[in-house]
Amino acid sequence: MKKNTWIAVLLFCLPLALNAQKFEGLAQTPPMGWNSWNKFACNIDENLIKTIADAMVESGLRDAGYVYLNLDDCWHGERDSLGFIQADPLKFPSGMKALGDYIHSKGLKFGIYSDAGRKTCGGRPGSFGHEYQDALQYAKWGVDYLKYDWCETEDINPVGAYNLMRDALRAAGRPILFSMCEWGHSKPWTWAKETGHMWRTTGDIFNCFDCVDQHPGWAAYGVLQILDMQNGLRQYAGPGHWNDPDMLEVGNGQSVNEDRAHFSMWSMLAAPLILGNDIRSMSQQTKDILMNKEVIAVNQDKLGIQGLKFAAEDGLEFWFKPLADNDWAFCVLNRSTTDKQYVIDWQKFNLYDEVSKRFTDFDSKVYTIRNLWTNQNEGDTKKVRPVTIPGHDV
């Protein structure tokens, strides 16, 4: 019998061209970084961003791969007499070029936010009608990443709007990762591969594991709800073009079990890992989750293939993700609030993956099992494996 290594996630405890394209070579693995919105919303300023930059270095997050520091909404001031956007002078008195220089001095990359509409979601000036000016300004400031939102766009075509900003970024000449935040309304996974480097597949995430935060005309979703919305999308993801199920809520008050499950599933999805917590005051448990090198390696695997849900039974879901070197990641998610016991009979998990064109073949192959949360090898797949999965955990 052929012996393969198998990683198992088992958790117990330029000039404008006529046919402009996005910048190739960026986001060859899912982008990793931090964004201000989930924790701070519009309450951001120059001092906060600098202290976050410091914390990304001092905590070890930068060296773990989290390199993008992204300002979300509400950094904007007004446009100058020529129409160029300026930073809010009260919040960012030194200006965006100086802030970008500070971020770059820390070995980080500078991310910024705008909106395809006339106003951002926070009521600041949007980029509509100023796309080329804004792209030039971002390039001048040294921006490396643009999140482009979709508020105030009632009469705007999303394909045209996002392609327009893509072309503007290309014309400005600085390689900028283009993160499309259209909330999945126009199914961007079907058309945006040549437009952006990542696209939101859903509305906003809400800081809960299993809930819907309903509002008139829109809703925000818990971890499980967003996970369910990824069904049928995996074939559209890959190096340079990722499905984005939104930023992480790890470290924002959910249980350790829920945080671990959240991080595990986003890693299995090959999703961008964009933190949304206050990294200046993380608990050790949060650090241990966010900086687990072996789980991050599943997310960052060079094949860039999104995981799939193979089966579900009694509140448990069984997920596989093909990895390089003929390895597989395997994860059992417990959606229920109570502990679940299960005996894994590997022969029942023979599957052929249409995306990777690979077969698990437990009948003729023996895989070594490695628990990525304990960082220990735990036998192989020759024998059945009894497991206990805590509620809302993996």
For each predicted feature, which ranges?
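Aromatic-lined carbohydrate-binding/catalytic grooves of carbohydrate-active enzymes
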Residues: 52, 56-155
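Carbohydrate-binding surface patches
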Residues: 266-269, 274-276, 312-356
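C-terminal beta-strand-rich structural cap/linker in extracellular carbohydrate-active enzymes
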Residues: 379-394
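Structural recognition of the beta-strand scaffold that forms the well-ordered cores
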Residues: 26, 30-36, 65-71, 109-114, ...
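N-terminal module-boundary/linker segments of secreted carbohydrate-active enzymes
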Residues: 21-46, 50, 55
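Catalytic cores of secreted or luminal carbohydrate-active enzymes
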Residues: 260-311
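Bacterial Sec-dependent N-terminal signal peptides
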Residues: 1-22
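Glycan-recognition surfaces
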Residues: 133, 177-278
